[in-house]
């Protein structure tokens, strides 16, 4: 090894160039001595033990890390699943995505009120319709007869003995309802003082009686005329 501390090659330059085995004698090998050539030992380009030292240092550091991790208590590395579990009694109630408890309460209250309005039996519907027809203002013209609560002509209205008897004339109950024969009905909410549900029910009932009204009118037993505007 030279004074600068660099490592020399094991074979001389002449033997290495000829690719023969060198006796590695210094300062001159036996082959160079026999041939009378200059025997030189060049500096090697490989780092040698320096790379080996780096590998050993890396292994030592990894071993040290493993040893330090092994000495740490297990509870500090990962939490105990039993200690972090939330009791079922303390968990908040589940709600669908995009909803809040307040919105659910409002929706349930609206649904209950709507369900209660549609849960009336058929007999209660008939009583409500009769009461509505009784208290509803019945418009009359100058030539029309007064109607009683049942929709017929009152007995107190007597015509003159000289005037000919006229056939009874039916007047519309709701001003917005046109002639039944035309099958036209108002939208819910157009009749004042009436709930949309009741108007919808009246429209359905009137639609079912159109066919019967046409049959009676063709037989000459029912005369329907338009109300005076």
From Swiss-Prot:
Keyword field contains Transcription regulation: yes
Alphabetized GO MF terms: DNA binding; DNA-binding transcription factor activity, RNA polymerase II-specific; zinc ion binding
Gene Ontology cellular-component annotations: nucleus
DNA-binding region (UniProt annotation): 12-39
Location of this chain's protein in the cell: Nucleus
CDD domains, A to Z: GAL4
Name used for this protein in its record: Geodin cluster transcription factor
Organism expressing this protein natively: Aspergillus terreus (strain NIH 2624 / FGSC A1156)
């Amino acid at each position: 090894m030279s004074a600068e501390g660099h490592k020399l090659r094991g074979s001389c330059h002449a033997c290495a160039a000829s690719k023969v085995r060198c006796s590695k004698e210094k300062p001159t090998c036996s082959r160079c001595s026999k041939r009378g050539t200059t025997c030189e030992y060049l500096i090697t380009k490989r780092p040698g033990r320096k790379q080996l030292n780096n590998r050993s240092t890396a292994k030592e550091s990894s071993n040290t890390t493993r040893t330090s991790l092994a000495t740490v208590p297990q509870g500090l590395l990962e939490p105990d699943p039993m200690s972090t579990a939330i009791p079922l009694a303390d968990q908040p109630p589940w709600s669908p995505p995009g909803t809040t408890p307040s919105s659910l309460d409002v929706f349930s209250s609206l649904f209950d009120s709507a369900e209660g309005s549609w849960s009336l039996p058929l007999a209660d519907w008939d009583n409500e319709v009769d009461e509505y027809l009784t208290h509803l203002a019945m418009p009359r013209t100058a030539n029309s007869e007064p109607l009683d609560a049942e929709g017929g002509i009152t007995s107190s209205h007597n015509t003159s003995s000289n005037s000919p008897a006229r056939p009874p004339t039916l007047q519309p109950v709701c001003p917005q309802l046109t002639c039944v024969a035309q099958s036209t009905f108002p939208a819910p909410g157009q009749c004042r003082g009436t709930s949309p549900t009741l108007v919808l029910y009246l429209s359905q009932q009137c639609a079912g009686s159109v066919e019967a009204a046409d049959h009676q009118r063709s037989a000459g037993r029912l005369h329907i005329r338009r109300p005076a505007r």
